[in-house]
């Protein structure tokens, strides 16, 4: 099955310079033991955290750290990320072993 990643790029309004990184980031370890998303996921989690923290500081420059921390936690948790993933049908682009 061939996946059209350009549709995903349109949904997120970003064109990847290196499409291989996109494919690797969507490849589960069960599909490819060597070239999968584990290290990219590790890095991506940190990048997401930094971007969210920076944006919160820009939007709420006078807010107390405790409030910012709660807002941050609500934005980077699994539930929020899952909702965003579903909204762009990310499951249609993930490579995972399926023994049907």
Give the predicted meaning of each segment.
Residues 1-100:
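RNase III-family endoribonuclease catalytic core
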């Amino acid at each position: 099955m061939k996946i059209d990643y350009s549709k995903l790029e349109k949904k997120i309004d970003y064109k990847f310079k290196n499409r291989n990184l996109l494919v690797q980031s969507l490849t589960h370890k069960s599909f490819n033991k060597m070239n999968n998303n584990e290290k990219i996921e590790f890095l991506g989690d940190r990048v997401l955290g930094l971007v969210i923290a920076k944006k919160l500081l820009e939007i709420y420059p006078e807010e107390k750290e405790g409030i910012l921390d709660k807002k941050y936690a609500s934005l980077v948790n699994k539930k929020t990320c899952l909702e965003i993933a579903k909204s762009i049908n990310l499951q249609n682009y993930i490579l995972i072993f399926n023994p049907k």
